[in-house]
């Protein structure tokens, strides 16, 4: 779960932003079910050789420079690889050094100069050389509201502090080389007099001030399971449309039954028996209608986020003996690329606060919390297996942690 219940342990986002604005360093802690790590973070425009040396000496992790996509494009810095297979899809770009006035590029002073250039609005591609000793990271549009990672947190904090949208981060490791976890991070913050916050609190801070989805239209939708209101939403990040089916009065109600369902054309529309998606969708509609009120958020995340064409290619690999996870990995994808931040914002827009979540996937709970939603119960969604999807369901249980 996210660390937000321990708010008294952490500094407010307002205090953290003030320190970033003053050129100071802070510690940002992420989700215990994600990396469960803390990073040193500061605005790139405030970098000094002493700051780089502190990160290298006391942080001990990889010093990286998160930036908005537009900034990296302006500097002519491309992705390191075309197919990102890193565990948390950290978007590494080609490493760089300053083109002039450095030695080997690795010293604290050299790296500080390179980072300074990356934050300069007037900098151009010729001001940098590739490869180098500084590692740029691309932050997702929408920041932590789109992806709850340190990359996005660094850029968001810089932006909130009225700095340029370029940050610096470095993971914090213990003396023995292991990753520092929350107890060690709290001691580290106290020892070095650094503010410490969580990504969950940053999400909450932004969520209460910004919204990345907008409701476009609402229509009546009579179905075999009852009458629903169908709400059309548009993402302000990428223009993608998502849907919310609402049964009954849900705004301001407590413990509303909710299903966040990712699009599956083959299962939802064609009734494919290779998966359980279509059966789960119809069962969710049945349960929501039976409860008297509830919401089904229909997210356009075909094929666990890889898209329709790659999913069909993954099906072909499954016919050759690969399971669903192995097929994704064979194509260069992680086993699950879905994200639930926009789905959470849709639920908040509908007036929900406490929900009963229809899911067999514990990771979905992590993806929704931190956006002002409290999940008071995980409700299993049961559908009967068939001979065509038995192996698929076994893989979901054994490799993806689904509670089946």
Positions of the model-derived regions?
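Catalytic domains of riboflavin
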Residues: 2-404
């Amino acid at each position: 779960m996210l660390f937000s219940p321990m708010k008294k342990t952490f500094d407010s986002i307002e205090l953290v932003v003030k320190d970033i604005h003053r050129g100071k360093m802070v510690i940002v802690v992420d989700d215990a079910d994600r990396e469960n790590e803390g990073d040193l973070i500061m605005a790139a425009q405030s970098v000094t050789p002493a700051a780089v040396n502190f990160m290298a000496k006391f942080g001990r992790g990889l010093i990286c420079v998160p930036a908005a996509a537009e900034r990296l494009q302006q500097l002519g810095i491309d992705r390191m690889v075309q197919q990102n297979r890193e565990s948390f899809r950290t978007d590494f770009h080609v490493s760089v050094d300053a083109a002039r006035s450095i030695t080997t590029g690795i010293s604290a002073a050299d790296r500080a100069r390179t980072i300074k250039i990356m934050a300069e609005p007037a900098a151009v591609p010729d001001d940098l050389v590739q490869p180098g000793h500084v590692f740029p990271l691309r932050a997702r549009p929408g920041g932590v509201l789109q992806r709850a990672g340190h990359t996005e947190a660094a850029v968001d904090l810089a932006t909130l502090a009225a700095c340029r949208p370029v940050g610096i981060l470095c993971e914090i490791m213990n003396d023995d080389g292991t990753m520092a976890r929350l107890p060690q991070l709290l001691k580290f913050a106290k020892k070095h007099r650094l503010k410490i916050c969580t990504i969950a609190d940053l999400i909450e801070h932004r969520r209460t001030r910004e919204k990345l989805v907008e409701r476009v239209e609402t229509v009546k939708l009579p179905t075999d399971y009852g009458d629903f209101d169908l709400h059309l939403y548009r993402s302000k990040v990428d223009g993608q449309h998502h849907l919310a089916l609402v049964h009954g009065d849900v705004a301001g109600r407590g413990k509303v039954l909710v299903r966040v369902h990712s699009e599956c054309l083959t299962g939802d529309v064609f009734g494919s028996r290779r998966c359980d998606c279509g059966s789960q969708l119809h069962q969710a509609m049945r349960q929501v209608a039976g409860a008297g009120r509830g919401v089904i958020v229909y997210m356009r995340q075909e094929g666990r986020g890889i898209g329709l064409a790659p999913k069909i290619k993954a099906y072909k690999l499954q016919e050759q003996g690969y399971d669903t996870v192995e097929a994704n990995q064979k194509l260069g994808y992680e086993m699950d690329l879905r994200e639930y931040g926009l789905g959470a914002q849709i639920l908040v827009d509908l007036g929900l606060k406490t929900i009963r979540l229809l899911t067999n996937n514990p990771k979905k709970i992590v993806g929704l919390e931190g956006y002002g939603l409290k999940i008071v119960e995980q409700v299993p969604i049961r559908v009967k297996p068939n001979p065509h999807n038995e192996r698929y369901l076994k893989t979901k249980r054994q490799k993806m942690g689904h509670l089946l």
